[in-house]
């Protein structure tokens, strides 16, 4: 197996670990593959988080507490590009589950992970989730789209 195949397998494993951590609502596991200086631009405000906020397990735990059961994450159409000690993976993800208030979110988002190899291990240096907006003047988030 070449280094590129090994690197891609490691990155896919990290993505799988993230989905498992989300499902079990394990904040420690969620941040285990984060670089110390990670920048997170997820769906919740603000526009982006500082590195110290991106690794904040307390914020994750508060969000996990808004769900009554597991949080499902499906990654689809994942493409990975690797060059030296940098890599990125992008695709679409589906998040679903049941909130404590009875809501049952089931939304697809666009997702990009940027990785940096540090001391022989791939770490997530940047994480970005987004949804498109309808450009009909309403600027509503298009959370009803499906691949």
Language model segments and positions:
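Amphipathic alpha-helical repeat scaffolds
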Residues: 12, 16-20
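Generic short beta-strand segments
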Residues: 91-98
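Short beta-strand edge/turn micro-motifs at domain boundaries
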Residues: 108-138
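Basic/polar N-terminal segments that are highly enriched at the extreme N-terminus
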Residues: 1-9, 145-147
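Short helix-adjacent coil turns
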Residues: 18, 25-26
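A solvent-exposed, acidic/Ser-Thr-rich amphipathic alpha-helical stretch
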Residues: 5-8, 13, 27-83, 92, ...
């Amino acid at each position: 197996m070449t280094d590129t195949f090994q690197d891609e397998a490691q990155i896919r494993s990290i993505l799988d670990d993230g989905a498992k951590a989300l499902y079990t609502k394990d904040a420690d596991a969620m941040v285990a593959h984060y670089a110390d200086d990670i920048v997170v631009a997820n769906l919740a405000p603000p526009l982006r988080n500082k590195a110290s906020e991106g690794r904040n397990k307390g914020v994750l735990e508060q969000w996990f507490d808004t769900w009554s059961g597991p949080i499902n994450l499906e990654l689809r159409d994942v493409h990975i590009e690797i060059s030296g000690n940098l890599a990125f993976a992008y695709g679409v993800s589906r998040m679903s589950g049941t909130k404590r208030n009875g809501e049952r979110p089931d939304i697809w988002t666009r997702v990009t992970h940027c990785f940096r190899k540090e001391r022989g291990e791939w770490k997530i240096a940047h994480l970005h989730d987004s949804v498109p907006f309808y450009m009909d003047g309403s600027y509503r988030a298009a959370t009803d789209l499906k691949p």
